[in-house]
Amino acid sequence: MIHTTAIVPASAKLGQNVEIGAYAVLEDGVEIGDNSLIEAHAHIKRGARIGRGCSVGSFATVSGDPQDLHFDRATVSFVEIGDGTAVREGATVHRATAAGGSTRVGKNCLLMANSHIGHDCVVGDRCILAPFCALGGFVRMGNDAFISGGVMLHQKIRVGDGVMISGVSAFSEDIPPYVNAHKRNTVAGINLIGMRRRNTPAAAVAEVKRLYMAVYSGGVCADNAGKLLAQKAYSTPEGENFLRFFAEPGRHYIHVDREKRR
C-alpha cells in the first residue's frame, strides 16, 4: 500500500507487498524488495537498493550524499541494504563517494534510532548499531558486531566479527574479532558472552581466549599474531580468523586497558 501523500516516482522499482507511509519521499530509480516497509516521512534517495523484508523508520534517510567536501553530487553511487535489516527512526546511511561504488549494510542488521553509517562503509550481517553511534567513511565491520550507544568510529578503521563495544567510547584503531572494546582505543578481553550466545563451540572459545592472551602478552600485537599464524597455532575457524585479522599491513590496533591489568 502506498499512502496518497507519499512521493513515489514511476522509475522506482518496488517489490510485492511494499508499504509506503504518509509523506515518505522516494527518489528516481530506488529499489525496494518484497515485503518491506517505508514509514511516514522517511526519505529514500537516489542510489538506494533496499532488500526484502526491510524497514525504514520515520525521518530516516537512506542514500544521502556523502559528508565529503570534495564530493560531486552528480556522481552516481549507491547504498545496498541486505534482506531483513531495520533502519530505525532518524538513522542515516550515506552513499559511496566514487562513481559506481556502494556503501553496504548486510542482512538482518538493526540500525537503531539516530545511528549513522558514513560513505563507503561495509557492514556485515546481524550487526547492531545502538542510538547515536556513528561510523566514519570507509569503516569495515564484520558480522555479529554490537556497537553501543554514542560510540564514534574513525574513518577507515576495521571492526572484527563478534565485537562488543561499550557505550560512549571512541576508536581510531582496528578492533580485532571477538573482543570487548571500551573507552578510547582499548581492549578489555574476549566477548565471551557474545560468543556463547552465538553457540560458538567451547573449543573455539577457549582457543580464541588463549590466542588473545598470547597476542596481547607484550610487544607488538601484530608481530605476535604473525608468528602464531606462521606456526599455525590454531585449530578452529575462529582462532584463524582472530589471527588473520592482524595480517593486513600498515594497520594499528587497539591496546590493552592498563587499568584492567591492575
Which stretches of residues belong to each language-model region?
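Structural signal for interior beta-strand "rungs" in well-ordered beta-sheet cores
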Residues: 1-186
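Terminal amphipathic alpha-helical/low-complexity segments used for targeting or macromolecular assembly
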Residues: 1-5, 10-11, 16-17, 53, ...
